[in-house]
Amino acid sequence: MRPPPRLEYSLTGVRKSLGGKGPLRSPPNSMMKLKDLFKDSLRNLGLYMPPAPLWVRPLSARSCFCRAVVQNGLLNRRQMVHAALRYRLGRSKNDAVIYWQIDQMGRVHDGKLMWYGADCHRLKDRHATWVTYLMKQYFKLPQGSFQSNHVFFGLHLVREPCTVCIVEAEKSAVILSELYPQYVWLAAGGLFELQPQKFWALQHYQIILLPDTDEELRAYTQWYAVAQQVMQSFLWPKQNRIYVSDFLERHASADQKRRKIDLVDYIQEST
């Protein structure tokens, strides 16, 4: 059996049958890749190939935050990579970490971009921003055109019966998840980001709140009030109490309270 003709000979025949002269040559850098050919074949068959989820595209453990965590000895590299994959951390083009807010159904609600210095603390001169805000700017949409419904950072990890610990900063949730893996660690994203409506996805779980500390007990008082408001709702299961930990209030020094440290800071300074 004779071998099939080479592709260029076949194209030459097609060229001649169309009245052209000489061999048919592809323009430079236009050779179709195998994966593109596969996509075209599926498209011709009427099959739909959904794009990768938004959080998958910039998934990275090399952002300024991840590097600072390893360099300061808060986690080793293996732990950092594991935590980055679990929390689906991203990285922007200008080296910010992206904290994706993903619910238990896998839906992305928003992404928070933050910058950290070499000491693993936030850069005060660079304010956090949101992916939805940047998208509105890019597509020239009015800022009031739509509002994202924020959820707890790390909510996608709450699936099986577990004890859920909620801290203020996303950074703390990521680090503590490797130090105390027996709990599922979520983050509110700020002192006043602990809002009652965010708790409805957690009404069947045991919840422990761990606010930051300060001299005036403002964080503890604020979070305690929110916990009481949630538990007093007639829709909240009465057997599921929300505990507000006063660990930092009892153990932090006066100087630490003045600096408004969180649990990660306390652990780092105690070792």
Language-model region placement:
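TOPRIM fold recognition
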Residues: 104, 161-164, 170-271
